[in-house]
């Protein structure tokens, strides 16, 4: 064991915390702990580049969300005496229960009488705690049914695709990030499920129609993919759209007004909508 390690600390607004965690995971950082209203990142390697990258990422988010204040504060980088911080990191990750779905890490015990979803957080791309993912998990328990042809559009960690597979759907996944596909396939293996098809890219590469599509991606991308999404919906198919900031909700509803809005949910500023393809008008 090396004698010293580097510790990067910062405080981030709760609503944006998961964006920063996913950003760090995407850069290959595995030892992250949430504690004392802040985030600790530890490594034997220098974290100076990561510190700089987090500041740039925060600036971009501030611009994207039109904020007039800083998202992160108290950013500090120190060198410390070593200890088993991997075990400390594991203690800081909490499982999440969404109705009957229990999402937990590979080292946490399963919960009886629940649908257990096992995730390796070191694989990045989300662990189910974000408001948008939470909403999708609730909706999928209602609309996932055996033998449905389903698509997880922008699969990330594969949590949503795994849930649909657990309910008996024939699931396909896609993401524009090859690492997300790898992460999803590995998490599927951990959960004993298979995806019917997986590809790096978007819905334009999909073949045929789907009975269920879930897209937990940002509003701008949903708006860009609107026509492709609709063109791949079977009659009476269910479409779940999530990852939408409330300031974009009106635009989303306008674009999808030809479908029947059958359910919606908002947690903090994050909105999710469920549509049925009844071919209105």
Curated annotation (Swiss-Prot):
Which Enzyme Commission numbers does its entry carry? Answer: 2.1.1.-
Indicate the enzyme's highest-level EC class: transferase
Q: Which reaction does it catalyse?
A: L-lysyl-[protein] + 3 S-adenosyl-L-methionine = N(6),N(6),N(6)-trimethyl-L-lysyl-[protein] + 3 S-adenosyl-L-homocysteine + 3 H(+)
Q: Which GO terms describe its biological process?
A: methylation
What single Pfam family name could you report for this chain, choosing any that match?
Answer: PrmA
Question: What are the record keywords, sorted?
Answer: Cytoplasm, Methyltransferase, S-adenosyl-L-methionine, Transferase
Query: Which cell locations does it reside in?
Result: Cytoplasm
- Positions that bind S-adenosyl-L-methionine: 133, 154, 175, 216
The family database entries (InterPro entries) matched by this protein are listed as: Ribosomal_L11_MeTrfase_PrmA, Ribosomal_PrmA_MeTrfase, SAM-dependent_MTases_sf
Q: Which GO terms describe its molecular function?
A: protein-lysine N-methyltransferase activity
**The family this protein is said to belong to:** Belongs to the methyltransferase superfamily. PrmA family.
UniProt function note: Methylates ribosomal protein L11.
What name does UniProt use for this protein? Ribosomal protein L11 methyltransferase
Q: Which organism is it from?
A: Campylobacter jejuni subsp. jejuni serotype O:23/36 (strain 81-176)
| Gene that encodes it | prmA
